[in-house]
Amino acid sequence: MRIGHGFDVHAFGGEGPLIIGGVRIPYEKGLLAHSDGDVALHALTDALLGAAALGDIGKLFPDTDEAYKGADSRELLREALRQIAQKGYRVGNVDVTIIAQAPKMLPHAPQMRINIAEDLGIHMDEVNVKATTTEKLGFTGRGEGIACEAVALLIKA
């Protein structure tokens, strides 16, 4: 078994769309990013890549490569999974924590779990998504952006 941890953060900017966990969330702002800015899937991808000792999302999908401009993070996650499978691992379970003052994430968590389970080819019982605030402290508390942490367990296939 191998464990990986991932973290991502993006600042709000522009009109959107706001996509978190593969879900389009109604909100007046989007996140500034080279790809679609999905902090949840970016953190999760980093956790999975880290567990497999494959580097990180920036190494695999560099923001200097125009091929990834506006990229769908679900596609990036699936490509990372293919590379992990080539190393002989499968996903055991994943846990994602979204850190945002607004918008509220909890109503969207069930669909995020469905998306992640589908993309990783695992059961929903092996996917957890939760959200928290920083009690109005720091950049997320001031509503300047969204952060996310994720952990992943890989098992030898």
From Swiss-Prot:
Pathway(s) per entry: Isoprenoid biosynthesis; isopentenyl diphosphate biosynthesis via DXP pathway; isopentenyl diphosphate from 1-deoxy-D-xylulose 5-phosphate: step 4/6
Superkingdom to which the source organism belongs: Bacteria
Cofactor(s) this protein cannot do without: a divalent metal cation
Catalytic activity: 4-CDP-2-C-methyl-D-erythritol 2-phosphate = 2-C-methyl-D-erythritol 2,4-cyclic diphosphate + CMP
Pfam assignment, any one: YgbB
Entry note: cofactor: Binds 1 divalent metal cation per subunit.
Subunit structure of this chain's protein: Homotrimer.
Role this protein plays: Involved in the biosynthesis of isopentenyl diphosphate (IPP) and dimethylallyl diphosphate (DMAPP), two major building blocks of isoprenoid compounds. Catalyzes the conversion of 4-diphosphocytidyl-2-C-methyl-D-erythritol 2-phosphate (CDP-ME2P) to 2-C-methyl-D-erythritol 2,4-cyclodiphosphate (ME-CPP) with a corresponding release of cytidine 5-monophosphate (CMP).
Protein name per Swiss-Prot or TrEMBL: 2-C-methyl-D-erythritol 2,4-cyclodiphosphate synthase
Source species: Erwinia tasmaniensis (strain DSM 17950 / CFBP 7177 / CIP 109463 / NCPPB 4357 / Et1/99)
